[in-house]
A protein has these predicted regions:
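Bacterial Sec-dependent N-terminal signal peptides
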Residues: 1-23
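Carbohydrate-interacting regions of secretory-pathway proteins
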Residues: 21-241
Length: 241
């Protein structure tokens, strides 16, 4: 077995091992390393609607997960939905983990470095979006930056390691010493030098060109997007480095 195949097999086994564990639970090792749960599995304590207070009623607890419940899609916002963000502002280096799954043709995203200020109307005005979506939406389409694992409008994932609709996907986001790394289902799909010319150019040419991150300011909230379709999140964890 080649080294590459062995590495891939190791990650696959790790993914199955994670799913065999209890959801929304910190292991003794995670506690020792300083991880904290952002979602208890029972309520949305620690979260609020972007620019408001309580999350909309479309955000529910289902299957020990945060669920945006959209029985019938009608536009890009769910009735009584809206984007939600954590209460804690993150400054400096950190790690983030979560599981997500979607319904057919669903579209959502996990946002980082979100600023919640009156001059910003939407979460996506400032937040860097890691796409959460059913990639069949884009079957046959020209390569774009709107598929799962992509940074929306900024950078493509270098691999398309997505599980089928209805199955859980594991994302691991790390920002450390100006290096940004994202793994999806155990495979590294994004690696960027945030102080480098390539990354700065990508941000400057995106819809985030006027956002604080375009000026090298990487702090803020983490958010979950309501884009008018059903999606679940669980095992949402944070470690400040």
């Amino acid at each position: 077995m080649s080294k590459i195949n062995f590495t891939a097999l190791f990650y696959i086994i790790s993914v199955f091992a994670v799913h065999a564990q209890k959801s929304n639970f910190l292991t003794p090792q995670e506690k020792k390393e300083g991880w904290k749960l952002l979602f208890s599995g029972t309520d949305l304590k620690g979260w609020h609607a972007y620019g408001a207070k309580e999350p909309g009623s479309a955000w529910k607890i289902d299957q020990d997960a945060i669920k945006l419940d959209v029985p019938e899609r009608a536009g890009n916002k769910a009735k009584n939905g809206g984007d939600i963000v954590i209460d804690q502002i993150i400054n400096g280096d950190f790690e983030f983990k979560a599981d997500w799954k979607v319904t057919k043709y669903a579209n959502s995203g996990i946002f980082f470095f979100v600023k919640e200020e009156s001059k910003y109307k939407n979460m996506h005005d400032t937040g860097l979006e890691l796409q959460v979506t059913d990639n069949t939406i884009y079957e046959g389409a020209k390569e774009n930056t709107h598929r799962a694992g992509d940074f929306f409008g900024v950078a493509n994932a270098r691999l398309r390691e997505i599980n089928p609709v209805g199955e859980w996907n594991l994302v691991h986001f790390v920002m450390k010493k100006n290096k940004l790394t994202v793994s999806l289902n155990g495979f590294v799909v994004q690696e960027h030098d945030m102080a480098g010319a390539d990354w700065k150019k990508r941000v400057a040419e995106s819809n985030l060109k006027n956002a604080p991150i375009a000026k090298g300011i990487y702090s803020g909230l983490i958010g979950l997007q309501d884009w008018g379709s059903t999606v679940w999140y669980r095992n949402v964890k944070l470690r400040v480095l």
